[in-house]
Regions:
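Short, charged low-complexity linear segments at domain edges
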Residues: 1-10
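Active-site diphosphate/adenylate-binding microenvironment
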Residues: 12-75
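Thiamine diphosphate
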Residues: 55-133
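Conserved small/polar residues in nucleotide/adenosyl-binding loops
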Residues: 137-139
Length: 139
């Protein structure tokens, strides 16, 4: 059996990460699967990506894709500021930010707005599961 390779001659398995521990059916795993597929199809080198995340269920997802890339899990709502700094000193990396509904639109709304205002060079994915799932008291 011949394995399918992308333009970089990498197997799709080179783009995966660890096994998910998220609740079945929330949708975050499907987002991770689509990130894997897009990065593989577009021939993006995993080592040239920096995954940034905040706090919450969504912040766990970077562990499930692009396992050979760089990553940083930041303080709740503050991921855009950390990404700004990392972006300024690491021009050779592409930044992929993953944040949840609470992390982005609640405590992090100010950070999010300023990242937009600064026109920060990153892909920012908001994963909305509709709850503050990891803090449990909000469910």
């Amino acid at each position: 059996m011949m394995l399918k390779l992308n333009v970089l001659e990498l197997e799709k398995s080179e783009y995966t990460g660890g096994k998910s521990s998220l609740c079945p059916g929330c949708g975050h795993d499907q987002i991770s699967n689509n990130i894997i597929q897009a990065a593989w199809e577009n021939g993006i080198q995993p080592e040239k990506i920096a995954k940034m995340s905040g706090i919450g269920c969504s912040s766990k997802t970077p562990a499930y894709f692009l396992g050979k890339s760089h990553g940083f899990n930041t303080v709740h709502g503050r991921m855009p500021s950390v990404t700004t700094g990392a972006n300024l000193v690491n021009k050779g990396l592409s930044f992929l930010a993953v944040s949840g509904d609470g992390d982005t639109a609640s405590i992090g709304i100010g950070q999010f707005v300023h990242a937009i205002r600064r026109n920060l060079d990153m892909v920012y994915i908001v994963e909305n599961n509709g709850v503050y799932g990891l803090s449990l008291i909000h469910i």
